[in-house]
Amino acid sequence: MKEPRIRGGLPLVWLWVLLAVAPGESLAKETAFVEVVLFESSPNGDYKTHTTELQGRFSRAGATISAEGEIVQMHPLGLCNNNDEEDLYEYGWVGVVKLEQPEMDPKPCLTVLGKAKRAVQRGATAVIFDVSDNPDAVEQLNQGLEDPLKRPVVYMKGMDAIKLMNIVNKQKGARARIQHRPPRQPTEYFDMGIFLAFFVVVSLVCLILLIKIKLKQRRSQNSMNRMAVQALEKMETRKFKAKGKVPREGSCGGLDTLSSSSTSDCAICLEKYIDGEELRVIPCTHRFHKRCVDPWLLQNHTCPHCRHNIIEQKKGGHGPVCVENSSNRGRQQQQQRVILPVHYPGRVQRTGPIAAYPTRTSMGPHGNPITVLTVERPLEPDLYPARTPTFLAGYRPVSLDHASSGHHCDLEHPPYPAPPAGHGFRRAKYSGRGFNNGTCYSQYETMYQHYYFQGLSYPHQQEVGGSQAPRVVENGHNHSFHSGNNMLYQPAPTLMHMAPPSSVGSCYLHSQHQHRSVCSGYLADVPCSDSSSSSSASSAQGHASSSDSMLDCTEASNQGVYGSCSTFRSSLSSDFDPYVYRSRSPARTGGGDAPGCGGEGGTGSGRGRVECRSHQTFPNSPSRDRLSSCSMEMNYSSNSSLERRGAVISSGTVPDASVSISQGGGKDRRGPEKGCTCCFQRQAGDPSSDCTNLYLGPDPHQTSGPSSSGGLYSVTSSILHRTDPGTVLGHPSRPCCLYEENHGSCYNEDYAVSIQYALAEAAAAAAAAAVAGCEAGQPIPIIPEDPGYDGGLECVGHVSWEMEGEEEEEEVLYCQEGPCCALAEETRALCRSTGKEGAGSTTGQDCHPTDRD
């Protein structure tokens, strides 16, 4: 109902506005502004001016223009005469006529319009009529003429007319100025009202804008504060634990604590952390007192140390969470799984990549973040089907059965795959090689922060038929893998280290760390007792110790997280690969003197470690750095990632072992590396040589024939067990931690071998000599440790396992025509080979170095 009324009232409003404005505009146009200036003279001759402003109306009988002139009063009767003989005034005057009442006008007389015309004819610039007594004169003037006058005709009445007549009657001299618009005022160009109105409007607009901006900023600030509070609530807090008090159990309770191995003081208040004090761990892994950093985070939203924005990472991970539900756990593992190579302290092992999951992150001693990873083992293949990574897409899954591996130790040995034929562990710059791996590695796995090793790359699939798979036969036992519950992929093996078990109450990590959490960082050797300085009896017990420094049990976990403090041969000037760390093998000698194999050290239980019969101490090596035939040392070449010290000069021979050495394309064997101590059990009646003899020269069985150019061969006993003298090789099963090298090639960064040189004609005498040491012999590395050497060694070699016989088999490594024999021409040293008195099989050797530039 209201809407029609409004629509009907709008035309009326507009009509009223037009009616109000139109007369105003017409009146504004017809208004005549008369300014009268009076001149008064003083006795001294000065003149004073007085200005009087009056208003009148322009009539239609004249023009609407401006006029100015001296005021001349004219009597109305004087304009009634049409006589032209009257005196005429000069042009430029303004005539003022006061009209009388109509009854008083003489007749005949001119009309009002005729009087105006008569005044203009006599020279008036304008005519002003006072119509106060004769209102009908206005109608006469507004009737208009066909030919209006060219000068203005103005009529006045009321107070303005009275003022004008007073000035004319009393003053002798006055001047009038008629304008059709009001005269300009000094304040015309500055109107305070308009200015105030404009100022108020602008001020209101600015105030509204400021209020709007302020409200927007406040809303944004409140939103940021809310986000900061939410991020702070989701941020993890941990309680500080002093060194040695960090729980070792693989539960979520252990993840809520921080050890003192990293920075132990707050960067804000510079106070030391107290045991049990609550710390705030920022997603950038920096930690501070909760009371110190929370106000800063709420106000600035950034880390005080690295300016990391916590709001941007609010949707990221917020600390470890224990997932009890199996489905959630499987989904989380699929999203966070990382396939990484694994590094085990102790000795070299090769296995495929293992899936691991980030558990928590802490800071290392140098400010680098170290992530604790959890190893994934597919214990429930039915619930969690394995997903093949991209680089493992073409590899066949292998089902393993640990029960058929023939292992004899009492450790838990997870199933471990053997690589198929053709799947080699290849290098980036050199040709590949194949390895056949055992399955013995410890339950506690230490994953290192460095994921790739220098010079190594992932394998490439090679099309090899199933008939080309390497045969592993030992003493009639075929170590085949049967089907089991655990499914592992078998890509090319990856370098790993592990710590061997210990049999004497030293806290081996297998017994104390049953959880799956592993630490990233350098865990050098993980020993718990230093047996390097013990007697020969204690040195026979299995442990993995560094020759420079040891760790206690309380520092084992911190060592795994923040790096080993017993860095093997670590120095700022050393030139080794920092990403590949190897400790000594279980067969490393521990004492200062090398006990014989038949000594007290060899009479321990089956778990004891038996040393070689004699070890030669070299002048240029540390007294505690002794090598055995199964020792693994750190690589000192910056270009290498693997280093194998294959053989050591020994004083024993190989009794009851038929030696078959082939030059050229013959089958080669190499003594297996000794792994865990369980594989070193000796059985009575198994005589074998304890040390590997490495010779440079022609085949001892071919001394009568023409000698080839400086070939390198090694005579070892097949699958050597540490046995007492006089026993024979006879363990029915193959050691699980031995590995074989298939299609091996010689590389200058792969092997550092201590050798002996002997003349061909002195081979028989050298074989017969049974000397405990070689005073004149010096250890000569075959390949100089030249970091800048990039050329690959084109040694032709083929290592494989084949059945030589039911009772005995040998292993020969042959390298023909390669730079691995290049130092022979430089040294030309004569060294004798040692042998066992009364040996059934005598090894002779010649040293025929090849002369090369």
Swiss-Prot record:
The chain crosses the membrane at residues 193-213. GO terms for cellular component: plasma membrane. Residues 214-853 are cytoplasmic. Its EC number is 2.3.2.27. Pathway: Protein modification; protein ubiquitination. Belongs to the ZNRF3 family. It is a single-pass type I membrane protein. It catalyses: S-ubiquitinyl-[E2 ubiquitin-conjugating enzyme]-L-cysteine + [acceptor protein]-L-lysine = [E2 ubiquitin-conjugating enzyme]-L-cysteine + N(6)-ubiquitinyl-[acceptor protein]-L-lysine. Coiled coil: none annotated. Keywords: Cell membrane, Developmental protein, Membrane, Metal-binding, Signal, Transferase, Transmembrane, Transmembrane helix, Ubl conjugation pathway, Wnt signaling pathway, Zinc, Zinc-finger. Residues 615-629 have a biased composition (Polar residues). Disruption phenotype: Simultaneous knockdown of RNF43 and ZNRF3 results in ectopic limb development. Disulfide bonds: none annotated. Residues 1-28 form the signal peptide. It holds the Pfam family ZNRF_3_ecto. SMART domains: RING (SM00184). Residues 29-192 are extracellular. E3 ubiquitin-protein ligase that acts as a negative regulator of the Wnt signaling pathway by mediating the ubiquitination and subsequent degradation of Wnt receptor complex components. Along with RSPO2 and RNF43, constitutes a master switch that governs limb specification. The lineage of its organism: Eukaryota, Metazoa, Chordata, Craniata, Vertebrata. The keyword Zinc-finger applies. It is an enzyme of class 2 (transferase). Residues 583-629, 650-673, 685-713, 834-853 are annotated as: Disordered. GO terms for molecular function: ubiquitin protein ligase activity; ubiquitin-protein transferase activity; zinc ion binding. GO terms for biological process: anterior/posterior pattern specification; limb development; negative regulation of canonical Wnt signaling pathway; negative regulation of non-canonical Wnt signaling pathway; negative regulation of Wnt signaling pathway; protein ubiquitination; stem cell proliferation; ubiquitin-dependent protein catabolic process. It is found in: Cell membrane. This is E3 ubiquitin-protein ligase ZNRF3. A zinc finger (RING-type) spans 266-307.
